[in-house]
Amino acid sequence: MTTIGNHMKFNVHRSLREQVRSFYIDVLQCTMIPSPAPNLELYLFPDKFVLGVFFCDESEVLSEEDHLKAAWLEIKTKDVQALKQRLVEFGVKEVEYADKSRFYFQAPGGQVFRLAPEDGGI
């Protein structure tokens, strides 16, 4: 059996640290856990998924446009409308996509996510 693990990392420009922190803690309600490095913040999702965000120089990060061509992730929630409202109020950039049944957006730093119901299938 093969599975995908519960850890992911990406690089974000160092100037976005406060915005990223607010996004993952205030909007997505993650918990920040201790990090082994000063340029790394670790965010724990309720399902025990750990996201590592490295704060880097411009030469080490993808542009928002490049993120549109990179891997997209999915965030599942019990209350899609409530989370979508928090995302919009925070100011995420909506991503236009053919699938209009879901809300696609870019987090601070450019990572693309799709918002889906927890029990909503594919």
Locations of regions flagged by a protein language model:
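A short alpha-helix capping/helix-coil boundary motif
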Residues: 1, 61-64, 81
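N-terminal beta-strand motif that seeds the catalytic metal site of vicinal oxygen chelate
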Residues: 1-21, 71-73, 119-122
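Vicinal oxygen chelate
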Residues: 1-3, 33, 84-122
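Residues that flank catalytic or metal-binding motifs in active/ligand-binding sites
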Residues: 4, 47-49, 69-71, 101
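Generic recognition of long tandem-repeat/solenoid scaffolds
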Residues: 15, 42-45, 102-106
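Amphipathic alpha-helical segments
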Residues: 15-32, 86-89
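Conserved short beta-strand elements that form part of the metal-binding/catalytic scaffold
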Residues: 31-67, 112-119
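Mid-chain, well-packed structural core segment of small domains
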Residues: 66-84
